[in-house]
Amino acid sequence: MRNFTFYSPTFFAFGKDTEKDAGKYVRRFGGTKVLIHYGGGSVVRSGLLDRVKASLEEEGLPYVVLGGVKPNPRSGLVYEGIDLCRKEGVDFVLAVGGGSTIDSSKAIAAGTVYDGDFWDFYSGKPITEALPVGTILTIAAAGSEGSPDSVITNENGMFKRGASGDAIRPRFSILNPALTQTLPPYQTACGVTDIMAHLYERYLTNTRDVEVTDRLIEALLLTMIHEGPRVIENPDDYEARANIMWAGMMAHNNSCGVGRT
């Protein structure tokens, strides 16, 4: 096993109806005005956006909203979010969605407090400062809810780059497996596949004697093998979705990758 450091300070609230406490967590982590960032209409149609707004209002927290995040989040919406945050005096970014929404939120959070072009961070500049970010996860897949990573597509050339830094690691993440029960089977299956890919990326290593992380990865892979078909057969199976959601976080917060290369 190689030397390593491990830092994973995200606060997690896991379980049914936990999104109703979003306002409490925003205030706990220093937010006074919030950007609610989300993707498509499902967040609106399901009533989730209204519940999030109500939670913020209960805490007396003003907010602005910015929807429209697409898969492989685009730089154009990040610039729009940065401008909105600066104009409105936003000091906390709340992502409501999956990995693309969370990655876009992280980019907005970093860009808002930076004098230059946020794309500098996706060209190698270290991220040392950002607005705090919180998440409400709606699909178990990317693992961005517990990681310091973000990937954005630059629309000037349509290429993707990543950035990473503890400043953009979510301060809190709300994980309610019930929010994933309305996902189509295809998206659910893609999420399971994404989680397994993250695990294989860490499992395949030349580092010897990493028994703890070997066994941890194997346990998570077995969980995916067991729970994936189960949740496709019964999309309302809360327990299967709960296991998948927590495994997705563990697969990408690097607890499985320490001490190995």
Which residues does each PLM region occupy?
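ATP/NTP phosphate-donor binding region
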Residues: 1-92
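Short Gly/Thr/Asp-enriched flexible loops that form oxyanion-binding sites at enzyme active sites
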Residues: 51-52, 80-82, 101-114, 146-149
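Active-site nucleophile and cofactor-binding loops and adjacent substrate-binding regions
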Residues: 70, 96-98, 259-261
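A glycine/threonine-rich phosphate-anchoring loop and its flanking beta-alpha core
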Residues: 113-209
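Active-site segments that bind and position negatively charged phosphate/pyrophosphate groups
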Residues: 202, 206-261
